[in-house]
Amino acid sequence: MSGELKRGLEGVLVAESKLSFIDGDAGQLVYCGYDIEDLARDASYEEVLYLLWHGALPTGEELDAFSDELAAHRDLDDGVLDVARELAEQDESPMAALRTLVSAMSAYDESADFEDVTDREVNLEKAKRITAKMPSVLAAYARFRRGDDYVEPDESLNHAANFLYMLNGEEPNEVLAETFDMALVLHADHGLNASTFSAMVTSSTLSDLYSAVTSAIGTLSGSLHGGANANVMRMLKDVDDSDMDPTEWVKDALDRGERVAGFGHRVYNVKDPRAKILGAKSEALGEAAGDMKWYEMSVAIEEYIGEEKGLAPNVDFYSASTYYQMGIPIDLYTPIFAVSRAGGWIAHVLEQYEDNRLIRPRARYTGEKDLDFTPVDER
């Protein structure tokens, strides 16, 4: 076997997609032809889901019908709730719990074992159920582990507001609901990242949609992919607890050889466009609360890292302070990433099914050859 070895598959083209376009030099992200700044400002998460799954923005009538269908699928079967309670009692990590619960959801989906896993209409219905129920299982698990009861979904609320309602037991105000909806839009898709590629590899074997999403959640749980926003917030809290100037704290961390979370990206060579939008939201939340500490600390660190390391923040950097100011527990940040990205994972799986080919790369063998076998009693 010959050819250039591409570790990490960096820069390797393995598929064609109409879903998202990234210009790493210009700092641009596009979903199905629409710039992320426009979508974050004007579109709901439901509109973005429809766009990713159908390739076009919905009409008002289509959006109403689509949103109603999603809302109708939010409630959970008793068996799934029982699993969530058990995981909470065992103090399972949120990402492991979400992975297990999504897999458990398939046991209560009559179409989960539908013979033709590539049937688009069946998969679209399945996609609605998965996407509608993922926020519900996460909220249920989070409430169970703190000793609270399950809050049934409210079909009058949109996708974002309903999650916050099911998590906290009270309807969020307009600012929090709109901020969370925008965060879901920003995280909905991002090309062939590791978790998306994992979902595509799984679906390329003609495994089902639940298996693909479960694979993606497992991949996102790794520290090199998901989890950076939680690490950013833990860092900000450490800085706050130290009473040090943020730049001095970061300088000391760098001198110790530590990595500062939330900076740099495999694709962007400039500031992540999503970080720009979330930074503005973090600032607005701070102003509304009369407490600019977390935003100002983040800005100071961004400026220092930019000057000293030439690195720009990615989406995780400002999502940390945004979520924290919304009162979301830190260890739910990555599961929320999964709740949002499920729409993109599913969109890529639908594309994969439309023109499927088993994904089967090769490795360059570097081991021994022509060894003589020695029986076990002679070794």
UniProtKB/Swiss-Prot annotation:
Miscellaneous comment as given in the Swiss-Prot or TrEMBL entry: When expressed in E.coli, CitZ is produced in a soluble but inactive form that can be reactivated by incubating with 2 M KCl. Citrate synthase is found in nearly all cells capable of oxidative metabolism.
Source taxon at top rank: Archaea
Lineage of origin: Archaea, Methanobacteriati, Methanobacteriota, Stenosarchaea group, Halobacteria
One GO term of the biological process aspect: tricarboxylic acid cycle
Organism (species): Haloferax volcanii (strain ATCC 29605 / DSM 3757 / JCM 8879 / NBRC 14742 / NCIMB 2012 / VKM B-1768 / DS2)
Protein name: Citrate synthase
GO function terms (MF aspect): citrate (Si)-synthase activity
Function as written in the Swiss-Prot or TrEMBL entry: Might regulate the synthesis and function of enzymes involved in later enzymatic steps of Krebs cycle.
InterPro entries on file: 2-MeCitrate/Citrate_synth_II, Cit_synth_Halo_CitZ, Citrate_synth-like_lrg_a-sub, Citrate_synth-like_sm_a-sub, Citrate_synthase, Citrate_synthase_bac-typ, Citrate_synthase_sf
Record-stated family: Belongs to the citrate synthase family.
Active site (catalytic residues): 225, 265, 316
Catalytic activity: oxaloacetate + acetyl-CoA + H2O = citrate + CoA + H(+)
SUPFAM superfamilies in the record: Citrate synthase (SSF48256)
EC number assigned by the record: 2.3.3.16
Gene: citZ
